[in-house]
Amino acid sequence: MSMSDPIADMLTRIRNAQAVEKASVVMPSSKLKVAIAKVLKDEGYIDEFAVTEQGGKSTLTIGLKYYAGRPVIERLERVSKPGLRVYKGRNEIPQVMNGLGVAIISTPQGLMTDRRARATGVGGEVICYVA
């Protein structure tokens, strides 16, 4: 059976791994998942990520980050889902926790944070919130 929402699965795997204080989490890879991992790394929410080939299938390994024994990512929430897509124009892009968190937006220029989308003046699909 195929997975209906691989991005929600990725976010859930990260949340579950952090709940049991794993050092890293492994999942099937895709271009969108790698782009999300790159944004998370650029924003300092994860240590590193790597894509490896195993038996013709690529896997994404994400190194999780902790501070004072607690996960750096406190909130990881899927916004736009396959059954209900959420699009925001350039003037409607949401702020997460008044700017303390990040919204990951899929724009025509690629995946970026809410701050960068506002600065660039583009809107798009709100993938998830991270705080």
Curated annotation (Swiss-Prot):
The lineage of its organism: Bacteria, Pseudomonadati, Pseudomonadota, Betaproteobacteria, Burkholderiales. One of its GO terms (molecular function) is rRNA binding. Belongs to the universal ribosomal protein uS8 family. HAMAP family: Ribosomal_uS8_B. PROSITE patterns: RIBOSOMAL_S8. Keywords: Ribonucleoprotein, Ribosomal protein, RNA-binding, rRNA-binding. One of the primary rRNA binding proteins, it binds directly to 16S rRNA central domain where it helps coordinate assembly of the platform of the 30S subunit. SUPFAM superfamilies: Ribosomal protein S8 (SSF56047). The keyword Iron-sulfur does not apply. This is Small ribosomal subunit protein uS8. The keyword RNA-binding applies. It comes from the Bacteria. NCBIfam families: PRK00136.1 (NF001109). One of its GO terms (cellular component) is ribonucleoprotein complex. One of its GO terms (biological process) is translation. Part of the 30S ribosomal subunit. Contacts proteins S5 and S12. The gene is rpsH.
